[in-house]
Amino acid sequence: NFRQLHSILQGHPDCKKVPGVDASTGSLGQGCSIAVGMALGAKVQGKDTKVFTLLGDGECQEGQIWEALMSAAHYKLDNLTVIVDNNGLQIDGSNEEVMSLGDMPAKLRVFGFDLHEIDGHDLDAIEAALGAPVTPGRPKAILAHTVKGKGVSFMEGQVGWHGKAPNEEQRQQALKELED
């Protein structure tokens, strides 16, 4: 089903098909802005609601992301958690080659986020970061250091697998390698 038209995992999340996805977005950073709006709306309405958004480090080259992050801190959205998949790669190459993000942890801290840096492949670390106490008045950022395609020999660290679906033989090999 991955990367096939009309499937639940056709590419970018489709809120009409994927349970738990509240907005259909692409790779242009809209998700963070939508999440900020949802978190702010919940605050204004007095709702005890937590909002989570997942970003790729490559999309953090979009200006809209930084405007959303500034707004989250400005409005003291302590009901917002931003998770950044920090794998260093995007569709066109490495982030360093395309446009360096510089010191991402420092940027998130300066923007007013309560930052948790983790190994994004460590489920215990993910659970601990998600469950860490909220700092009143500060949004939370989880910078998850990952390797694209981790655990699959022909995918690991390879830009070409950004949005490509494996054929049946590759799928079987990937599943075997992940099980081992």
Label each region the model flagged.
Residues 1-74:
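Cofactor-binding active-site loop characterized by glycine-rich and histidine/acidic residues
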Residues 62-87, 141-144:
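A short alpha/beta connector and helix-capping loop motif
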Residues 46-49, 96-129, 179:
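Conserved thiamine diphosphate
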Residues 75-101, 105-108:
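Histidine/lysine/aspartate-rich catalytic loop segments that bind and position anionic ligands
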Residues 14, 64-66, 92-96, 152-157:
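Short acidic, glycine/serine/threonine-rich loops at helix termini
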Residues 51-55, 81-85, 117-118, 143:
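Short, conserved beta-strand edge motifs with alternating hydrophobic and charged residues
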Residues 123, 128-180:
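Glycine/aspartate-rich loop-and-adjacent alpha/beta segment that forms the canonical ThDP
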